[in-house]
């Protein structure tokens, strides 16, 4: 499996994401935001956490209009896989690849801690390494992670089994406790928690490993 990790000015989790992909058996190529084309043969694109372009204007808004994001959108529209984590989730909502928006945390404070997530569905390449209903421990680190969408969108996400993860005790005010969602074809995942920070026992947790291993296995079998 070949993964491309996009790097913006202000990204700070691109190395962590690359290491998690590599540990799961993927080949990784870093892609700069000014690039216009993806590497040949890319199976999945990872958009990492951080503070792209300093979070100016709106989190993820400037990054979403960078040259590489046109190729990311085209990849997704062709049925390619994309994962956006934290700031990457914000970028995916700004590009329109995922619905909703990430607002300022309800408590108006930056939150950095490990939280309990409930796996809502195992019916995707990202989550098939878990069982629906599992509780996993994954770190969060964000100031604008409060997921919001109108009631109709929330109902559609829930009705189509597109809510991937929810918080067991919502830290940021996210509507319907949503921590991560899937696209309509289930090949784009956006999530605020950081599974790449829970993919090595030396870092204090391994609950994120199953996501990367399942994804690598699913794409290798295609």
Swiss-Prot record:
It catalyses: N(2)-formyl-N(1)-(5-phospho-beta-D-ribosyl)glycinamide + L-glutamine + ATP + H2O = 2-formamido-N(1)-(5-O-phospho-beta-D-ribosyl)acetamidine + L-glutamate + ADP + phosphate + H(+); L-glutamine + H2O = L-glutamate + NH4(+). Residues 3-222 form the Glutamine amidotransferase type-1 domain. The keyword Cytoplasm applies. Its main location: cytoplasm. It comes from the Bacteria. The active site is at 86 (nucleophile), 194, 196. Keywords: ATP-binding, Cytoplasm, Glutamine amidotransferase, Hydrolase, Ligase, Nucleotide-binding, Purine biosynthesis. Pfam families: GATase_5. SUPFAM superfamilies: Class I glutamine amidotransferase-like. GO terms for molecular function: ATP binding; glutaminase activity; phosphoribosylformylglycinamidine synthase activity. InterPro entries: Class_I_gatase-like, PRibForGlyAmidine_synth_PurQ. GO terms for cellular component: cytoplasm. SMART domains: GATase_5 (SM01211). Disulfide bonds: none annotated. The keyword ATP-binding applies. GO terms for biological process: 'de novo' IMP biosynthetic process. Its EC number is 6.3.5.3, 3.5.1.2. Pathway: Purine metabolism; IMP biosynthesis via de novo pathway; 5-amino-1-(5-phospho-D-ribosyl)imidazole from N(2)-formyl-N(1)-(5-phospho-D-ribosyl)glycinamide: step 1/2. It is found in: Cytoplasm. Part of the FGAM synthase complex composed of 1 PurL, 1 PurQ and 2 PurS subunits. Part of the phosphoribosylformylglycinamidine synthase complex involved in the purines biosynthetic pathway. Catalyzes the ATP-dependent conversion of formylglycinamide ribonucleotide (FGAR) and glutamine to yield formylglycinamidine ribonucleotide (FGAM) and glutamate. The FGAM synthase complex is composed of three subunits. PurQ produces an ammonia molecule by converting glutamine to glutamate. PurL transfers the ammonia molecule to FGAR to form FGAM in an ATP-dependent manner. This is Phosphoribosylformylglycinamidine synthase subunit PurQ. It comes from Roseobacter denitrificans (strain ATCC 33942 / OCh 114) (Erythrobacter sp. (strain OCh 114)).
């Amino acid at each position: 499996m070949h993964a491309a990790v996009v790097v913006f000015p202000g990204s700070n989790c691109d190395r962590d994401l690359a290491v998690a992909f590599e540990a799961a058996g993927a080949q990784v190529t870093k892609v700069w935001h000014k690039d216009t084309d993806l590497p040949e043969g890319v199976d999945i694109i990872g958009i990492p956490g951080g503070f792209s372009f300093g979070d100016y204007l709106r989190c993820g808004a400037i990054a979403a209009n960078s040259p590489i994001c046109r190729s990311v959108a085209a990849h997704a529209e062709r049925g390619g896989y994309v994962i956006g984590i934290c700031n990457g989730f914000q970028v995916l909502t700004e590009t329109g690849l995922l619905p909703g928006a990430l607002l300022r945390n309800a408590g108006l404070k930056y939150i950095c801690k490990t939280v309990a997530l409930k796996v809502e569905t195992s019916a995707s390449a990202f989550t098939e390494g878990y069982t629906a209903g599992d509780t996993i421990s994954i770190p969060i680190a964000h100031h604008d992670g409060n997921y919001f969408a109108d009631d109709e969108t929330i109902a559609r996400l829930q009705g189509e089994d597109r809510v991937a993860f929810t918080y067991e005790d919502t830290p940021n005010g996210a509507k319907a406790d949503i921590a991560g969602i899937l696209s309509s074809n289930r090949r784009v995942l956006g999530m605020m928690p950081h599974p790449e920070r829970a993919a090595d026992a030396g870092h204090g947790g391994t609950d994120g490993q199953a996501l990367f291993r399942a994804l690598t296995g699913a794409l290798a079998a295609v």
